[in-house]
């Protein structure tokens, strides 16, 4: 019971000191001064301290170690220790102060044993206050003397208000504060690094999306430009290629050169006669493997008889100009009343003999004058698929019964005129129907084979008067 009574005043005084903000601030200042004392202890030896300081600090550690002993003869003995022992204790106190900045909390927190229980609690509280004041005064003085710095020592009131328990509490609070300050700083670097990486990744994703959008938005345009460039390059290379790279066709070149001269020799002809005639024969000559012969029908009125004969001959001659061989000439005039089978045989012999001997063109004049049955031989030479000779040209002429042919007559009207004439000549009720004789169906089949191109010829007065002199 006596011990509890003695401890209560001291505990109350400690609680009051803990609750006082000014005391806490003084504890933090004492901690900072203690750290300066550690540096002072390294720079200056404890030997340079004055004797008064040694005596004051000797009381501090001894008071903490003995637990605030009463004023008895033992306290007098403590003051009579040898001087060297006092210096060692001063050094030890500086070392302890450098490590922990304050006296150990265990010794300060424990209640010292009181050898004199007769003292009242108020006397013990007074001695405790004196002890705390002496220990707190020693540290600031040593720090001030050792470092020689311009720091101002704390006041006497603040030193008296501090206690060993509060010094330990201040140290713990400072350590906690440092850990709290360092912890966010240590953790902030990974967080900042992570945020920077996230921002960088987001920026890269945005750039990828922009590139994708840009590609898909401009992709079709780029594709079209590339296709146009390829086509333009192909066309340019095709037209700018040297002439020697194109395979030459001597027959075509000779035909074009000679056919172009006919326009001057036969003036007054329709434009489509030259255009269509050139295109039709040029296509056939340019074909490497023609499937059928080139068959053309020229027609004219009776006033253009000589012009028709001369023009058809020169067109066939232009077609075979590369071979330097004249075309085959067959005339149906004067054979109307001959035997159709005989005429058919003669026509077959002349065409086959000439084509087999290298002639590439044949001119059949007055096709309308042949016996009807004899014209069936042209199935053999003008068939679409099974013609006997496919790389040849057959030029047929039909003289209309009309006296004149208007220049305004077009190709279709000209074709109808020729067709009507042949139907009138080759089909009638008096003609017997047999295999060797013509009928309407056979004539329709023949017409489809020989009527690829029907062109009108206008008379040339000089030719009609003087004949074909060239």
UniProtKB/Swiss-Prot annotation:
It is found in: Endoplasmic reticulum membrane; Nucleus membrane. InterPro entries: LAP1C-like_C_sf (IPR038599), TOIP1/2 (IPR008662), TOIP1/2_C (IPR046753), TOIP1/2_N (IPR046754). The modification Phosphothreonine is found at residues 176, 193. The gene is TOR1AIP2. This is Torsin-1A-interacting protein 2. GO terms for biological process: endoplasmic reticulum organization; membrane organization; positive regulation of ATP-dependent activity; protein localization to nuclear envelope. Its main location: endoplasmic reticulum. Residues 236-470 are lumenal.
